[in-house]
Curated annotation (Swiss-Prot):
Disulphide-bonded residues: none
Protein name, entry field: Lipoprotein LpqB
Native species: Mycobacterium bovis (strain ATCC BAA-935 / AF2122/97)
Entry annotated with the keyword Cytoplasm: no
Keyword list, A-Z: Cell membrane, Lipoprotein, Membrane, Palmitate, Signal
Subcellular location: Cell membrane
InterPro entries reported in the protein's UniProt record: GerMN, Lipoprotein_LpqB, Lipoprotein_LpqB_C
SMART domains: Germane
Length: 587
């Protein structure tokens, strides 16, 4: 797993700092392996003198290229084996492969052992995994006039890990959140060697829709019957230099059914952020049915034109940093700490809090008799600087989290997930249970932390010291459910204490691991360690935004900012070096 973290994090960091195979002639979705294009010259090919062991390893490398139903890999097979091999569906990424042979003069039978490092779905979704590869069945090689060839192999695709790293690149698709306020990341791995084909591939994937588990958590303004009229070109129609220099990109679509301006703006945002985050630069000329998507942007859109949906913006940035100090909420003002006006600055015994994503409201948990058998907790919600209303209670309540629709999510008594809202009819607080059956069934145990992503479509939880991710789905009846739970960050073990979303694709956690007390994990499940210089353990609460991470340590709150190159370690936050102080940010 250390190798997984070391190699994959290069892709992860590239995606954070920046922010499948071919060019389909139409917008019809094309799964991995079905696109036709020439086989890249750098892929291995079988040669007459190859030993069976070498030929098998080169075959695994060749499976990294999905084009033409894995044509590069099929060159290592006999005709009958190629006809019988089913390469559809997801692929397993494997490493540390060992072959055990039984050999005769004309035939070799092989069993394969390997470590599983992850999987790659047929739409390019990569997820980490761990464990030993179950016996896939025998592999048989026979000697032919051209040398050894594979004559029998199990169905499915096994990707060589190193070759996968060299062939596939991580890009992010963006879909609209249900409220229409922002866009939601959907990372994909694509194998496109020609940079001028990448824009078409990404827009085609947008048209094909989100990954299956996101189908009911996001909106896709590029859904059918909308389709591409042809490949994405330069803004002037040229076929080379797309998105480079001042060439821009031109997307021509047809069968547009969206008429209202806001939906068209969201449609443009999906395209623009998807291309911009792939370093395909504007201006972005977007046409539909032979006319500009919006007349005022006939000459092209820029990221500034869709800045309101920027997936990298910090929620409620104007609200700044707050903290709980001695049980009350304080604000940071020019490195001075002052109690906030109103109820949240007066109420004692506050143990967890969150500022709303607009920066105008607060949700705070008050805990009486903490640690005692008769411990009692209550959730209070109100305007920042105003009065508060009790919205939930229980034996214990975890740190609250705000959604984009201004609902407060909180875990009551270790495993009951609630949404606290203001009833639109009565104006009174309402507590609505969230269906967390899928989470409890797959990951039983107490929930120790729950935080919503900045777009509100995902929930990250700490259960049994592990990071568990689930989708936030609104049912037809208007209720909410946590769906498709899966584990992230196998390399973190069971050491996680608390978590916070740094971006929509990046979670930062505190851990009981004294050597690595703070780590990152992304939506693929890839984890890496943050610097630890200057940190004292144990660490408890953590709060983050795209630029800064704050943690609660034994002596108070510390901060780490990647932008401070001259000070790469953790630094004290002036005024918050008080034992028990905890950082509070919007979210």
């Amino acid at each position: 797993m250390e190798r997984l973290m070391r190699l994959t994090i290069l892709l992860f960091l590239g995606a954070v700092l920046a922010g499948c195979a071919s060019v389909p002639s139409t917008s019809a979705p094309q799964a991995i392996g079905t696109v036709e294009r020439p086989v890249p010259s750098n892929l291995p090919k079988p040669s007459p003198g190859m030993d069976p062991d070498v030929l098998l390893r080169e075959f695994l490398k060749a499976t990294a290229d999905p084009a033409n139903r894995h044509l590069a890999a099929r060159q290592f097979l006999t005709e009958s084996a190629s006809n019988a091999w089913d390469d559809a569906g997801s692929a397993l990424l494997i490493d540390h492969v060992v072959f055990v042979e039984t050999r005769s003069a004309e035939k070799v039978s092989v069993t394969m052992r390997a470590d599983i490092l992850g999987s790659l779905s047929d739409v390019g979704v990569f997820e980490t995994a761990e464990g030993q590869l179950p016996d896939p069945g025998p592999i048989e090689l026979v000697k032919t006039s051209g040398g050894w060839r594979i004559d029998r192999l199990p169905n499915g695709v096994f990707l060589d890990w190193q070759q996968f790293q060299e062939t596939y690149k991580r890009n992010t698709l963006y879909f609209a959140d249900p409220t229409g306020k922002t866009v939601v990341p959907d990372p994909r791995y694509v194998a496109v060697s020609d940079r001028d084909q990448l824009a078409t591939e990404l827009v085609s994937k947008l048209l094909a829709g989100p990954r299956p588990e996101m189908a009911r958590t996001v909106r896709n303004l590029l859904a059918p019957p909308l389709r591409l009229r042809g490949p994405v070109t330069r803004a002037d129609g040229g076929k080379s230099g797309i998105g480079r220099g001042y060439g821009g990109a031109r997307v021509d679509m047809e069968k547009l059914s969206t008429t209202d301006p806001h939906s068209r703006q969201l449609l443009a945002a999906q395209i623009i952020w998807t291309l911009a985050r792939a370093d395909i630069r504007g201006p972005y000329v977007i046409n539909a049915d032979g006319a500009p998507l919006e007349d005022r942007f006939a000459e092209g859109w820029t990221t500034s034109d869709v800045a309101a949906t920027d997936p990298g913006v910090a929620d409620g940035a104007a609200a700044g940093l707050h903290a709980l100090v001695n049980g009350s909420l304080v604000a940071m003002d020019a490195q001075r700490v002052t109690p906030v006006p109103g109820a949240f600055g007066r109420m004692p015994e506050q143990t967890a809090a969150a500022v709303s994503r607009s920066g105008r409201q607060v949700a705070s948990v008050v805990t009486l008799g903490r640690g005692a058998p008769d411990e009692a907790a209550s959730l209070w919600v109100g305007d920042l600087g105003g009065e508060a209303v009790q919205s939930a209670d229980g034996h214990s309540l975890l740190r609250p989290s705000w959604s984009l629709d201004d609902a407060v999510w909180v875990v009551v008594d270790t495993n009951v997930v609630l949404r606290a809202i203001q009833d639109p009819a009565s104006g009174q607080p309402a507590r609505i249970p969230v269906d967390s059956t899928a989470v409890a069934s797959r990951f039983p145990g107490a929930i120790n932390d729950l935080q919503l992503s900045r777009d509100g479509t995902r929930a990250a939880m700490v259960i049994g010291g592990q990071v568990i991710l689930a989708g936030v789905e609104q049912t037809q009846a208007g209720q909410f459910a946590l769906t498709y739970p899966r584990r992230l960050g196998f390399g973190l073990g069971s050491s996680v204490v608390s978590l916070s979303w740094r971006t929509g694709d990046d979670i930062v956690v505190t851990r009981t691991d004294a050597a690595h007390p703070v780590s990152y994990v992304n939506l693929d499940g890839v984890n890496s360690d943050a610097p630890s210089r200057g940190l004292q353990t144990p660490l408890t609460a953590i709060a983050a935004n795209p630029s800064t991470v704050y943690v609660a340590g034994p002596q108070g709150v510390l901060m780490y900012s990647a932008s401070v190159e001259s000070r790469p370690g953790w630094a004290d936050v002036p005024g918050l070096m008080v034992p028990g102080a905890a950082p509070v940010l919007p979210g």
